[in-house]
């Protein structure tokens, strides 16, 4: 299994251009939060409802498992920084705005991905996740690596 530093080095290969980096620092958190919003609104089996789970929670459990495999408490910090505010917001807003959470999340998700692809067009390199889907989980860590020192 790759170390966090190995993931960052490989991810960084297709993220050298200043404009692309700026676009990523805006779009990656938006994609993360909007994906959680979309997953939050997808109907779940009755057994999930009885214990208060939804598809966002399931996704976060898989993401956390991957992050734990990287053996870094700072990674867990980024996970919490991304997941906890989103879950609190969705839990509070879902009864109030309902389907609008889904619609607004889809709009943000699509626009943020368009931004990502524009960034990669400027960069002149394909997104890393074309090579390995796990890079979709590395992106948020890489974006926050400037804020939280990962001792790269």
Regions found by a protein language model. Name each.
Residues 8-29, 63-75, 122, 149:
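Membrane interfacial helix-start motif at the N-side
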Residues 57-61, 76-80, 102-106:
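Hydrophobic alpha-helical transmembrane segments
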Residues 36-54, 88-105:
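Helix-coil boundary and interhelical linker segments in multi-pass alpha-helical membrane proteins
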Residues 60-73, 108-124, 143-147:
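Transmembrane alpha-helical segments that form the membrane-embedded catalytic/substrate-channel core
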Residues 76-84, 131-133:
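Cytoplasmic-side transmembrane-helix entry/capping segments in multi-pass membrane proteins
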Residues 34-36, 58-66, 82-90:
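Hydrophobic, membrane-inserted alpha-helices
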Residues 2-53:
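Alpha-helical transmembrane segments and their cytosolic membrane-interface
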Residues 1-14, 18, 121-152:
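Membrane-proximal soluble regions of multi-pass membrane proteins
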